[in-house]
Curated annotation (Swiss-Prot):
Subunit structure: Part of the 30S ribosomal subunit.
Keyword Ribosomal protein: yes
Disulfide bridge map: none
GO cellular component: cytoplasm; small ribosomal subunit
GO molecular function: structural constituent of ribosome
Recorded name of the encoding gene: rpsP
Name recorded for this polypeptide: Small ribosomal subunit protein bS16
Function: Binds to the lower part of the body of the 30S subunit, where it stabilizes two of its domains.
Any GO BP annotation: translation
InterPro entries the record matches: Ribosomal_bS16, Ribosomal_bS16_dom_sf
One Pfam family it belongs to: Ribosomal_S16
Keyword Ribonucleoprotein: yes
PANTHER family listed in its UniProt record: 30S RIBOSOMAL PROTEIN S16, SMALL RIBOSOMAL SUBUNIT PROTEIN BS16M
Length: 88
């Protein structure tokens, strides 16, 4: 199964996360299929969340399952807004 989840990078006590598409059996920080964004939980920069919305929608359309945290971040980035309007 393909998942959209967070992969940690950055230094000790200063986490940053890549939002990646990966096989569910891979390690958290292991090889991934595609990087679709990044997230800075400390919000140290104005662009603390960046997501390639088009690629995220593509991966969701082909069946990728986001984790709870990834789903929350994708929702904040506006990935689900267009889909909700199309279905209504």
């Amino acid at each position: 199964m393909v998942k959209i989840r967070l992969a940690r990078f950055g230094s000790k006590h200063n986490p940053h996360y890549r939002i990646v598409v990966t096989d569910a059996r891979r390690k958290r920080d292991g090889k991934y299929i595609e990087k679709i964004g990044y997230y800075d939980p400390r919000k140290t920069t104005p662009d603390w969340l960046k997501v390639d919305v088009e690629r995220a929608r593509y991966w969701l359309s082909v069946g990728a399952q986001p984790t709870d945290t990834a789903r929350r971040l994708l929702r904040q980035a506006g990935v689900f807004r267009q889909e909700a309007r199309e279905g209504a």
